């Protein structure tokens, strides 16, 4: 039976100094021997998805102490990808994931905490904390801040449901008046919470439900709704129970690595494909699996993507559907329920809250459950009042969305498509793979070919798009924006949004070794691996080269003779130290970013660090 980790600092004569310091934090004689639960909060006033978290750590702490534990809270950093977007601030977004993971590890291991509650929400915070939880492998529960309400506004005589991307697209569209842009801007992000569509933050919070590491509703109940408070209260009690089961009953089934098994990662990816989640989830699931020692690879994602239907389309894939609508249709448990009925789910896996996912579905899938509490829970509605306060309203829909033929969530027979919402493309331009969010691609361009328009940075591509130098039929190629080449693998939301603004969203393709925001739609192919800075084929593309894309056959081809490509590679390699570097790019790269670039790996590996590539380590 394992000892409580905290005994290292709380027991024995030689720990008198440590106990003295614990006492200075409020620990009393009778507390020594109780499990010490770390609360990793991520409150910041920079990020709307985290601005309401300040008091929620102490809410959880109070429940932990009621349950017989000792709660100790600390904070991590949190980058707002929307605010960091479109300038060099985006270089720091993906690297912040590793910094968050490390900071959680540092705090938990330095102070010998016994268990962990992760209060996350936005794009890199949930993945970073997930990586840390799997690295530490102590009892852990995730509870996120919850989604933002969708904006509502009268524009052009119509009532529109809005989000961040609508504001970006409208601002770059000359056909939209300044007055309408101002209305959209003021209405797009009305409350606290993670941006209201199926963007990266909400996608990852949904996936924690499928992995089994968070409570039902974690991914979908609104940040503003009073029902979300219950998740924080339950998390406080449950984490103490999990700690006791592990340390006092030797029950290793409650540990993150026991729960987040290979099959659990398959469940998470199956959900992601079915709901058309952000392409960034691929990067983060690969990284989390790496931390867990689970051999979940790009090939597994490719395999799953070929057999899972698209059961749910949410903004940006469907502009009038947001997370509040997904919740009304039964949330993530409803999507998992449809996948289970289709025979596409491993329902026998444990979760932090139930002996098996199947048992949880019997209670929480609204098509199976007769529980009045569950039915009421999924009727939680937006308050439609701008606020930065959590749990500030209690509105409910009169009825649930149970329509599985034409509703927000479909059954397999009435799927949006039998091909899922994400696909992995391979070919000579992406030998290790690339990712496209097929849920956001119009059917008319599932097969596409055109001349390459090559750019060495996101900035130069944006300039060309806004100047009207990109025309229908072009394939925009943005390279040297991968994990190492950026460094930091910037998101390309501005280029894709501006293509839509110019009426080219269904007439052009964009290919990059960078990545895309969860808000991206259109024929946007990211994570091209190997990246340009690693000598990938994307570095050899020249202006006007024909590029052929076929989502149905999962192919991405640079239609240039092999002999010519070999010649180009020889010319590039002859540059020596200057080979596989951007020709002209004005970019200040800090010491912190250079250190990140030195250790990061391909997007096909989740852009995790590889210390083995540096012999001195």
From Swiss-Prot:
The keyword Iron applies. Keywords: 2Fe-2S, Amino-acid biosynthesis, Branched-chain amino acid biosynthesis, Iron, Iron-sulfur, Lyase, Magnesium, Metal-binding. GO terms for biological process: isoleucine biosynthetic process; L-valine biosynthetic process. Mg(2+) binds at residues 81, 123-124, 491. Its cofactor is [2Fe-2S] cluster; Mg(2+). The active site is at residue 517. It catalyses: (2R)-2,3-dihydroxy-3-methylbutanoate = 3-methyl-2-oxobutanoate + H2O; (2R,3R)-2,3-dihydroxy-3-methylpentanoate = (S)-3-methyl-2-oxopentanoate + H2O. [2Fe-2S] cluster binds at residues 122, 195. Its EC number is 4.2.1.9. GO terms for molecular function: 2 iron, 2 sulfur cluster binding; dihydroxy-acid dehydratase activity; magnesium ion binding. Homodimer. This is Dihydroxy-acid dehydratase. It comes from Beijerinckia indica subsp. indica (strain ATCC 9039 / DSM 1715 / NCIMB 8712). The gene is ilvD.
